[in-house]
Amino acid sequence: MLKDKNLLVLSHTYNSFIKDPVEILAKNFNKVYVLVRHNPLSELGNIIPLKFFKNRAKYSKRYLIDLTNKPENVEVIPVSFFYLPIKDLYLKAGPRHLRKVMQTIKKRNIKFDLIHAHFLWSAGYVGAKLSQKYNKPLVLTGHGYDVYKLPYSSKKFMKAIQSVLEQADKILTVSDENRKILNKLGAKDVRVLPNGYSKELFYFVEREKALKKLDLPRNRKIILTIGNLEEVKGYEYLIKAIKIVSKKEPSVLCLHIGSGSLEGQLKDLVTKLNIEKNFKFLGRKPHDKLVDYFGASEFFVSSSLSEGNPTVMFESLGCGKPYIGTKVGGVPDIINSPKYGLLCQPKDEQILADNIYKAIHKKWNTNEILKYSKQYSWDNVCKNILNIYERLLK
């Protein structure tokens, strides 16, 4: 039914949690256009050594867009415009984003039958305006900060986001906690569809094989953490937790993959706590190379202060690894049994350390974790999204 249809995706990124489902959904469409918001200010992060610009560096094109193995019928187009993500100034991003998208649609003669906008602002605003102008159905997905933080940042934002929600034909979100917030904002019939993982990229790898491939020591208790080195990820608490664990379990080795504006500060903390042998910063790694790091580890650990529904949690489960983390966003919906991981409140390094120590010495059932994870493969999640698309295009 959809093979003669074109899908327009509006997003703020084109990497894992957007890229993976889009490329599965694309098999059912004639053409998929993905218009990715890009702020040219993000390119200054490596040039101007000021905190504001360094914080924006993670949104530069090289991190924002991943074209690896992109299908031929998916066209990814950066939509560049300047905006300031600061309080009510960020409201101006909506109309600016819309103007740029309209110019791109006209310039490239883009034809579409359905719109799927990811994030309520500013992509959601653009989707709502396009839906009105072209009389096309709009699917809107709320992910994280755009749901639990942005609407409450000011009365103007509350009104703007409520207006966007009113114009969507179908609203999706990634966790039940988000659904409750959206209901309070006036959204009706919100469908919860969690994020997922790519079966092609994340799967069980024998530990010995992974250790050998990565040249990692066999006599260490290796745990993995992946994420931007930013305040919201709570890495200072994880580093302090590793210090506590190392006193009882000197063989612990936490490997961090990623980068961010707090890198220098967090490296200094590791040095100050004298745990350079227990906490290593590996920098960024390609998404398709992460499976071996999961394979080499005992489990995955997160210290996030807030989340929507972290993709890395599903990737961990998809590799047969338990998830040790914090009770934020949709995480407790997924890690709903001690068979799949252990959770604590954020900002509590002592309980996090206790959970890490327990996890090191617990006998985990890898097969049970793998079996549980299958429902969260992007293939399964996308079946539900396709059903929604088909109903809207009838």
Per-region residue spans from a language model:
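Aromatic "clamp/platform" in nucleotide-sugar-dependent glycosyltransferases that forms part
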Residues: 305
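Short hydrophobic beta-strand element within catalytic cores of glycosyltransferases
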Residues: 322-325
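Short alpha-helical donor nucleotide-sugar binding micro-motif in glycosyltransferases
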Residues: 284-285, 292-297
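Carbohydrate-associated surface elements
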Residues: 177, 196
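Conserved donor-binding/catalytic core segment of Leloir-type glycosyltransferases
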Residues: 172, 217-233, 239-242, 255
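Nucleotide-activated donor-binding/catalytic signature segment of Leloir-type glycosyltransferases, i.e.
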Residues: 267-285
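Conserved acidic donor-binding segment of nucleotide-sugar-dependent glycosyltransferases
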Residues: 337-338, 342-349, 358-363
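Acidic anion/phosphate-binding donor-loop and adjacent secondary structure
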Residues: 183-184, 197-213
